C-alpha cells in the first residue's frame, strides 16, 4: 500500500491565508505592514529563483519586501555596512541574506552581524543557543516548518526514535534540537557515520538532508516509517527530485513528503511567520 503523503503545499497555503489575515488586521489598526529585507549577492540561478519565490510570498500575505540585489564582487565590508543600516531601520523587521555567499565573504561573520531580533532565518548563534536551551524565539525555518507539518498530520515524535541524516547548520543540527524539544530520541548521522544502514532501518522518523541523491538506499526503509525529504535536485530533463528516490520509497513507508511540494513551501511560510513574529516583538 502506498505511503500517505505529507502535503506541504496544502498546509503552507492554509498558514499563508491565516497569516494574511493577521497582517491585514494589524494594518487596519493603523500599524505598518511587517518589512522583510531580502539581500541577494550575485546571480546564482538557484538563489535567484529562491529569492523570487520569497518576494512573491511576501506580496501574497501583505508583508513588504525590500529588495537588495548586489553584484557578486560586493565586498564583505560593503555587505556589513548594508546590514548595519538594515539593523537600524525602523521599516525593517527581518533580514534575510540569501545563502550561499560568494567565496570571498565569510558566511558566519555575516550572520553574526544581523541583529538576533531581526534574524528571521534563525541562524544567529544567539537564536540557535536559545533553541538549544529550550527557550526558542526565532527558529530556523526548515526545521520548524517540518515540525509544523508533523503537528498538522498528528505525527507525534514524542518517545519515538528520530534519525537525522545530515548535520548542516541550516537543517541537520537545528532539526535535531527541534526533535529533542518535542520529546524524541535523536540520532544524527553524517559523512563520518559508519553503518548508516543500521540507523536508517531502526528509525521511526527519518529526516534526510544530505544534499546528495541516493545516499539512502530504498531497501533500507521500513513500512512503519515517516520520511521527510529535505533535498532538492534539478535533473537534466528539468524535473525536480529529493535526496530519496520517491517513486520507490512511496511504496515502502507509511508517510512521506513529496519533492517538490513537501518541505520547500513550509520553509517559505515559516520565514513569513518569523517576520511577523519579529515585527510584533520589535513593536513591544
From Swiss-Prot:
Keywords: Amino-acid biosynthesis, Histidine biosynthesis, Hydrolase, Methionine biosynthesis, Multifunctional enzyme, NADP, One-carbon metabolism, Oxidoreductase, Purine biosynthesis
GO cellular component: cytosol
Pathway terms, separated by semicolons: One-carbon metabolism; tetrahydrofolate interconversion
InterPro entries for this protein: Aminoacid_DH-like_N_sf (IPR046346), NAD(P)-bd_dom_sf (IPR036291), THF_DH/CycHdrlase (IPR000672), THF_DH/CycHdrlase_cat_dom (IPR020630), THF_DH/CycHdrlase_CS (IPR020867), THF_DH/CycHdrlase_NAD-bd_dom (IPR020631)
Entry keyword annotation includes Protease: no
A GO MF label: methylenetetrahydrofolate dehydrogenase (NADP+) activity
GO biological process: L-histidine biosynthetic process; methionine biosynthetic process; purine nucleotide biosynthetic process; tetrahydrofolate interconversion
Subunit architecture: Homodimer.
Catalysed reaction, written as an equation: (6R)-5,10-methylene-5,6,7,8-tetrahydrofolate + NADP(+) = (6R)-5,10-methenyltetrahydrofolate + NADPH; (6R)-5,10-methenyltetrahydrofolate + H2O = (6R)-10-formyltetrahydrofolate + H(+)
Name of this chain's protein: Bifunctional protein FolD
Free-text function comment from the UniProt entry: Catalyzes the oxidation of 5,10-methylenetetrahydrofolate to 5,10-methenyltetrahydrofolate and then the hydrolysis of 5,10-methenyltetrahydrofolate to 10-formyltetrahydrofolate.
EC id: 1.5.1.5, 3.5.4.9
Similarity comment text for this entry: Belongs to the tetrahydrofolate dehydrogenase/cyclohydrolase family.
Residues noted as binding NADP(+) in the record, renumbered to the chain: 166-168
Pfam families named in the record: THF_DHG_CYH, THF_DHG_CYH_C
